[in-house]
């Protein structure tokens, strides 16, 4: 089974969310998602300053197998993107919960964060797939 860190929140679309000390949230795709996609060749990042709604497609992960939309797990403003992915998209594969993060968002509604899946609920979702 894929690694599912307890401290993160998860979406049903296989994005993860981690609260940072400054109150923003870092977003990436889960180990499960990157395993399904295979080796990353390109990540199309959102523009900093863009306002998104929960569920909006805001980035694209392109792998040797497919291109897959990455969805905003919560509504808010994109405040940073992982520029390292431009030169090293494989970080999404090698460090999905670390250096392979996709973007940071300032959430506009904390209730959306609370409504995301915890690690045990996400693990149950994976077992049902």
Swiss-Prot record:
Gene3D superfamilies: 2.40.50.100. One of its GO terms (biological process) is glycine decarboxylation via glycine cleavage system. Keywords: Lipoyl. It holds the Pfam family GCV_H. Binds 1 lipoyl cofactor covalently. The keyword Transmembrane does not apply. The keyword Transport does not apply. One of its GO terms (cellular component) is glycine cleavage complex. PANTHER family: GLYCINE CLEAVAGE SYSTEM H PROTEIN, GLYCINE CLEAVAGE SYSTEM H PROTEIN-RELATED. The glycine cleavage system catalyzes the degradation of glycine. The H protein shuttles the methylamine group of glycine from the P protein to the T protein. The glycine cleavage system is composed of four proteins: P, T, L and H. This is Glycine cleavage system H protein. It comes from Cronobacter sakazakii (strain ATCC BAA-894). The lineage of its organism: Bacteria, Pseudomonadati, Pseudomonadota, Gammaproteobacteria, Enterobacterales.
């Amino acid at each position: 089974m894929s690694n599912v860190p307890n401290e993160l929140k998860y979406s049903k679309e296989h994005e993860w969310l981690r609260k940072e000390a400054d109150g923003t949230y870092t977003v990436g795709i889960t180990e499960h998602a990157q395993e399904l996609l295979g080796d990353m060749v390109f990540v199309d990042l959102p523009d900093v300053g863009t306002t998104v709604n929960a569920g909006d497609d805001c980035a694209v992960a392109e792998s040797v197998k497919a291109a897959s939309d990455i969805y905003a797990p919560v509504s808010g403003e994109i405040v940073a993107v992982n520029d390292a992915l431009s030169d090293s998209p494989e970080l999404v594969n090698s460090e999905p919960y670390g250096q392979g993060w996709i973007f940071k968002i300032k959430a506009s509604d904390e209730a959306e964060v609370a409504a995301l899946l915890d690690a045990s609920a996400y693990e149950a979702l994976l077992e049902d797939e």
